[in-house]
Swiss-Prot record:
Pfam families: Ribosomal_L19. This is Large ribosomal subunit protein bL19. HAMAP family: Ribosomal_bL19 (MF_00402). The keyword Ribosomal protein applies. Belongs to the bacterial ribosomal protein bL19 family. Gene3D superfamilies: 2.30.30.790. This protein is located at the 30S-50S ribosomal subunit interface and may play a role in the structure and function of the aminoacyl-tRNA binding site. One of its GO terms (biological process) is translation. GO terms for molecular function: structural constituent of ribosome.
């Protein structure tokens, strides 16, 4: 058995454990979707959940290391954040609306401002 096969089998086992034990359900996500990600933040001695809402502009499928890049415009400045989907820091992921795009990566949205950054809504996939 090669090292890569061993690593992939261990990652598959860990993902199954996470799916069985975790209370958070990760919806089926696509590039272009608008999501609200609840991020656990510890301030002082208190822990709270901070929502981060934006459009998914990129996804990386890597088993346990699966990530999404979420972009939003805050006070006229574009802010992008990369989230590990299986991280314990992620409290929940809520799907707001589906987006209709023809690209796997939406990096072209970085060069656009205002209404040009909007993504059309997709109605043929359920929320």
């Amino acid at each position: 058995m090669k090292a890569q096969e061993i690593i992939s089998s261990i990652e598959a086992e860990e993902i199954e454990k996470l799916k069985q034990n975790s209370k958070k359900k990760i919806p089926l996500l696509y590039v272009g979707d608008t999501v609200k990600v609840g991020v656990k933040i510890i301030e002082g001695g208190k822990e709270r959940v901070q929502p981060y809402e934006g459009t998914i502009i990129a996804m990386r499928n890597g088993g346990i290391n699966e990530t999404i890049t979420v972009r939003r415009v805050f006070q006229g400045v574009g802010v992008e954040r990369v989230f590990l989907l299986h991280s314990p820091r992620i409290a929940n992921i809520k799907l707001i609306r589906r987006g209709k795009v023809r690209r796997a990566k939406l990096y072209y949205l970085r060069g656009r401002v205002g209404k040009a950054t909007r993504v059309k809504q997709r109605f043929d996939r359920s929320l």
